[in-house]
Amino acid sequence: NVLQQLGLGSGKRIGVEKQGFFFTVDEHQTLMEILPDNEFVEATEILWDSRMIKSQEEVDVMRHSASLVDMAMLAGYEATVPGATADQVSGVVNKTLFENGGEYMGLPPFILAGERSCLPHQTGGNVPLLDDDLMYFEISASKHRYTAALMRTIFLGTPKEEWLRVAEACIDAVQAAMETIKPGATPHEADTAARDVTSKAGFAEYHRNRLGYSIGVAYPPDWGEGEIISLRQEEHRPLQPGMTFHMPPLCLKYREFGIGFSESIVVTETGCERLSKLPCEIVIKS
């Protein structure tokens, strides 16, 4: 027993990650049975606190991941044509990620066409794109397990006016949040800034998700670490330099559309910076 070899066999107070994906109830029960003279206490938040602020070296790796996402997103744009399916476009995106040095992600790319985009954590689909259609992308990339992600929506032909107004509101919401984020500001304030934009544009009922969540090291079954800290109404801890987030404000109208735009960012000493270099703009392929 490793704990016994380390002199922790009895009479010790040992922290365990009760909220970890890979520490099961059965494993916890086994520890208590074979080492009954130890006290096992919850230590998850100690680990979360150590992961919340990234070093410059960690941010640099995440910038590299963001560059992979940019390449994959552009490849996805190119492959999005009438008649193509979301599954086919997903194949192009994955090929681009792995050919350029990416590693397996915490979650697959979420690439959805037309009305299927209203349920954004579906994967793919085999229904061909129409001449006047939309394609929703939420893609991550991983390098040395450090993750960056990006959400975009592109349009084919002549998009509906409502789609374009929603897209503009989502882009403006991202920008408003970035202008709010700085050391000392709170996630509540950032979420409010984004939500004010979509509300004033008339889409409050479609914008129901939190603004964003922490990102960093990730393994399946997730690419985020929102359990550590999220950009949401209920979170009031002050933001600090070195925190990294994926911010995907999106609007979902059931059986009609899912439209969103996002940025992965790092909080700096004076504000925040994008990790991606891909423009956050409306793209229409005619």
Predicted regions and their residues:
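Active-site neighborhoods and metal-handling regions in enzymes and metal-associated proteins
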Residues: 1-286
